[in-house]
Amino acid sequence: MRYINDAMKKNDTPKDGLINRIIELEWDMFDKVTNTGGRAACQDDEWTFYVMRFSQFSALNEAMLQSYEQDLLQAQREGRNMVTEKYGYMMEYTDPAYFDKQLKPVLPQVSPAKEELVDRIANLLLGFEKAFDARYPALYSKSRPLQGAEAGNVSFHLYAIGELKTYSQRTLELYYRQIAGIDPKDEEHNPSFVIHRTTTAFYGYTS
């Protein structure tokens, strides 16, 4: 198993420790993703991977994170790579023909109930991200496009859908329960604001 360098880890609270365990599991899976064009440079960019994933998880509560950790451990026991699956689900939108022929038969099937919950969460996350974009357009201009899949590019919305489809029903329900009542204009609790604040702090900026 490939491990994250301990020197770069934020480890101030029990939640930080939980997030670090999750990132270790994801990093090992990310390292093992195979690409048709060969190994991607980002697979060796440990710092950026750590910052991006830690920032995302900083916006989630411990109950949801604990459930997601169990999803990762279950996948590990079954010999599944949830990061590979995430990219596979995204290809339903970026390369539908390849997805239908090569990936759909081998990816874990997503039930109609799970599909509906994924869509509800992804749309909430899109609303949160739009609120951040409206507040900080110059900063958001450096991020993924919000929607669409032009020229094979994965938007924020499609990336969210791909990742959410790898989560268990239990984890999705905990996720939805956490974010369903948040006002997108509430900068303290809107997860997009939390994520971006955490990211900028890693790079030495303060809001």
Short names for language-model regions:
Residues 2, 9-10, 205-206:
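Composition-driven low-complexity repeats that form or flank extended alpha-helical/coiled-coil segments
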Residues 5, 9-42, 47, 51, ...:
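Terminal low-complexity "docking" segments
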Residues 11-18, 22, 46, 58, ...:
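Intrinsic-disorder-associated interaction segments
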Residues 36-60, 66-71, 82-84, 148, ...:
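A cross-kingdom feature marking solvent-exposed beta-strand/loop segments within repeated
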Residues 57-60, 64-73, 117-121, 164-167, ...:
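Short, structured motif recognition centered on aromatic/hydrophobic residues
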Residues 65, 70-111, 179-206:
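Repeat-associated, polar segments at repeat-unit boundaries in modular proteins
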Residues 113-165, 169-174:
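Surface-exposed interaction/gating patches
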